[in-house]
Amino acid sequence: MEEGRPRMGVIVPGNSSPVPALSAGRSTVEGYDPKLHDPFFDGVSQQLADKGFITAAADDLITWARTGSLMWMTFGLACCAVEMMQASMPRYDLERYGFAPRASPRQSDVMIVAGTLTNKMAPALRKVYDQMPEPRYVISMGSCANGGGYYYYSYSVVRGCDRVVPVDIYVPGCPPTAEALVYGVLQLQKKIRRTGTIER
């Protein structure tokens, strides 16, 4: 370090003398609590703040980016698909949340199951779900997709798409409004931010 330049330091609770940034390992700093702050990264952040950089955990950064670029697979099976289409139109505009439709499962992060799932359609649903890359999410939209709905007692209807694929968000209603689907999308984004996706 050059002579005459002030040294940057971090004040650590329980210690009266400043600890020079980047000079000590995290475990050797007295009073270190990882839930409150990290003196090491505080020092790095202070040094990089005026240069236009910011430091964050990689998992937080990845989940933040992932929630802003969710591509959904259109899987409209019945009348709920009309509301799903309406949510994409200019009045509700799901794309402002970074939620854009894709026709290929290999380019999709989210599948919206909208409508009545029949026994004949269940294998096709599972095949499309298996083609989606990890991490993948499923939104079950409407009473029929959630639990059979009107057709619960029919011999040809699957009583909930969660018997075929794992479901992350349930959107109730018959059919649910476009606002309900938008709310479900926002809940999915919160869930992704909260849980993260990097395996430890």
Swiss-Prot record:
Source organism: Caulobacter vibrioides (strain NA1000 / CB15N)
Quaternary structure (record): NDH-1 is composed of 14 different subunits. Subunits NuoB, C, D, E, F, and G constitute the peripheral sector of the complex.
PROSITE patterns: COMPLEX1_20K
Protein name: NADH-quinone oxidoreductase subunit B
Recorded GO CC terms: plasma membrane; respiratory chain complex I
GO terms assigned for molecular function: 4 iron, 4 sulfur cluster binding; iron ion binding; NADH dehydrogenase (ubiquinone) activity; NADH:ubiquinone reductase (non-electrogenic) activity; quinone binding
EC number: 7.1.1.-
Cofactor dependence: [4Fe-4S] cluster
Top-rank taxon: Bacteria
